[in-house]
Amino acid sequence: MTGASVADHTGRPIRVGLDVGGTKIDAVAVDPSGEIVGRLRRVTGWGDDAVVESIVAAVSALADEVGLPSSDIGSVGIGIPGLVDADAGRVDHAVNLGVESLELADRAEQALGIPFRVENDVKAAALGAAALSGVTGSMAYLNLGTGVAAGIVIDGRIWRGSRGTAGEVGHLSVDPNGRLCGCGQHGCVETFCGGGALAKAWGRPGALPIRDIFDAADAGDPLALALCTDLFHGAAAAVRVLVLSADVETVVIGGGLTALGDRLDGGIRAALHAGAEASPFMRSLRLDERIELLPAGSPAAAFGAALVGASITEKEIVPHG
């Protein structure tokens, strides 16, 4: 990301954050106090050009909603799936968007003349979840959606690791004889608690397979009961790994599966409690008391992208007033 032709927008009142998903963009406008003053959703395009066009359209529409010209936007942050080079503003292998390699920040800056920063979507969501939850120390954001991944925030900053893969707990193999994962391994955490893997294992038609699984489990269906158990134990395994490896104080759980609400929360807590019964050490960690569920529809991912776009050098988290 060169940014050579982008004007200095320091001090401009509005920061924009975009959570770019496979089907939709969730966009928020954030004022200097940290309040969300506008929010909208737009359909995501497919392929390099369409993705850029849909991002530009979302920013312009959001500016209209807030009642400001696009020139009053100080920065735009984008959270997007795939392998992201945050320094270069490039995203690679965003397969659900039809993107193999895209110089996203440069393309968007050329279209709007506004500074753009790009970050992996789950890492951006971790920042947003930390800010919205008021966490000031260490936390992890565990995303339970079609896939499974985590973002880790230590002392207000994203922890990326040496090669940017910190938090990829979905591809930790916990059962070498388990189901085949899309990554090529067997028995990954994602095969237990990822929405896509659960829907595939369920194998029955329906618009909302995860809800169908839970409804069938309530009716005593053996396969559904087994898949619910897999979900709870897989998510519990991810929580254990995050706490034991990074010693985070809190694990905030988000993603599409949080629409299950208390059923998901209670099941994961029960699995954590049961898994610690035989170990005084694990009991001492009180893992079942260290998880929080984001409300369904939370703007955490887009809000975190706005923080990323702000290019805050000392702290990436700002208080949410």
Predicted stretch roles:
Residues 1-75, 85-88, 110-114, 131-137, ...:
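ATP-binding/phosphotransfer module of carbohydrate and carboxylate kinases, centering on a glycine-rich
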Residues 19, 75-81, 119, 141-147, ...:
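Short beta-strand segments
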Residues 36, 91, 158-159:
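Hydrophobic "anchor" residues
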Residues 39-42, 95, 162:
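Short hydrophobic alpha-helix segments
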Residues 43-46, 99, 165-168:
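A short acidic/small-residue loop/turn micro-motif
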Residues 89-100:
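A charged helix-plus-loop insertion that forms the helical arch/lid used to bind
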Residues 112-130, 140-142:
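ATP-dependent carbohydrate kinase catalytic cores
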Residues 137-192:
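Glycine-rich phosphate-binding loop of actin/hexokinase-like ATP-binding domains
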